[in-house]
């Protein structure tokens, strides 16, 4: 019976095991171990029905994306876990916490971006960790903390690693293989491989390493090494594909005996591209450091930050250190910070920082130094209110003692608070929107003041502003204030205390004041409006002045050239037609002989009309008549026409000047006529001399006359003009008289008008007619004639 029950129980257990195998998986029950094989089954996640007693689990070649904490829970007996060739991008922390028996973990060919601190937590017996061909960009410092002493094989190749937790690698004392090839490593910490005595394979191929730290482990990679022990096996070392900087720092590596590697140099330029093992040792050289730039002197106010700069060059790049004035090596602390580029920042300066700071630049070839002189301006420290009440040992109260004494007899009493006394020693005046004048006074018995310090801050801001003032000044103008704001201001005195060898300070006094309000927008608008108004006013004044000036000129012109009504009524003029313009004279029928036509006389010159005043003609006639004898004047007075009384003498003008010249010419001609009339021979000669005028000779007189010398005449090559008399209708009337025309006996008496013409001729008139016509031509006009 017992045998039957045992058989049934064994059959049930076997059936249960077979039934627990996941779908699409193969479960093998080999003696005491159970293996679950699910490779390349298209799984999207870890099957939840996996037997928790599984020893070997293979899930490679699937499409698993995420690993959770429940996927491998309670699999304490799992020894080998393969998750290769999936698309795993995230592993939840503590997902492998129950895999305490796991020896081998394969996570290669996935998409893991990083390994966190708790990603591999719980793998206390892990020996093989394969994480190659991922996208690892960083590994946490404690990611390998649980299996540092048990790990034998670590493969991190074909990732994007810029660095490793080298401290953790240093403690992997049982490590046999370390694959770090095809990454972005550019630095290996010195002493990383010092304790890896069991390391048999080290692959650093295809990284960005420029140098390797010297380590005794690399001596086991020499080809001549024949002795090997299980505790110190030969080292297979590969570091090809790195841009090695072949200088004196790699001279130790060059001295190793290797004959089968093809490493090349990446720098310097003289060795670039050459095989590392073919370069002579003499060519591995370095350059000593040279400081190219540094701070020389620095003046800093106590309590403020200070920056000291020091730059150096060399091969290899030198390291820069700073030494304080007390020969102390300056490092990173809460008050100082040293950067890789050689800059030293002192965040808060003290009096102990005053002195020379030394910059030391050192490399494998030597060192260089430079000194930076730092001067700290010590600030006086404000004492509390309780210390002001009792006089200190340095007699600080003497500064304000005078103010107390001066007001001691004022009846204020001894009960007045002592703190109110120093406040009255400071006076603020001349307060504007952005400035204020501060004045203070101290007693003569006070110690010798070294310097004054002015402290003030805005009532809306807690920032305290300091101003250092020489001891010789007792007033100071505070500028750059904010308008419409209250300020608290205190004046402190500082001097050297001989007892403590420190700077002693005390408050001289305090005051409060408000700056005036400012309205910049309104003020600017007012100035703009005022400026525009001034421009308009000035422009209006200029325009009005110009208008008045123009009106005055017009009125003056009209007054000077206006003819009076009496003269216009008395004057009779006649139309004169040029002898060469082709016009016909008007008919003379009905006009009696000796009667003047009622037409204004004109002289035509180049089609330009120019009227001369009547006074000019009268002045010419009066000057001509005055040269005659008294008998002739009496004869003219008895004529049928009487001349009106002479007009007032006109103002000097061009017309008057020309008339004067004409009068002088006529006067000379009249004298010659008088001489000719007295002698018969002379009369005939005079008649003949004036009766033949050519077209080229002016009628005003011979070429040598004074009028001709003043009036410019055309030359031979130009149109010829002559000066002639134009008597208007007198010529026509004389022509109508039977008997033809006779030359005038006295030409000067009929010079009432002048005409410029090409063919001038002398018109015949009797002397009696001219005397009567003189009253008619009271006003004359000049007409310019066009010539053909």
Swiss-Prot record:
Glycans are attached at residues 29, 332, 341, 384. Pfam families: fn3, I-set, LRR_8. Forms heteromeric complexes with LRFN1, LRFN3, LRFN4 and LRFN5. Can form homomeric complexes, but not across cell junctions. Interacts with DLG4. Directly interacts with DLG1, DLG2 and DLG3. Directly interacts with 2 NMDA receptor subunits GRIN1 and GRIN2A. Residues 289-375 form the Ig-like domain. The chain crosses the membrane at residues 535-555. Residues 242-288 form the LRRCT domain. This is Leucine-rich repeat and fibronectin type-III domain-containing protein 2. InterPro entries: Cys-rich_flank_reg_C (IPR000483), FN3_dom (IPR003961), FN3_sf (IPR036116), Ig-like_dom (IPR007110), Ig-like_dom_sf (IPR036179), Ig-like_fold (IPR013783), Ig_I-set (IPR013098), Ig_sub (IPR003599). Residues 21-52 form the LRRNT domain.
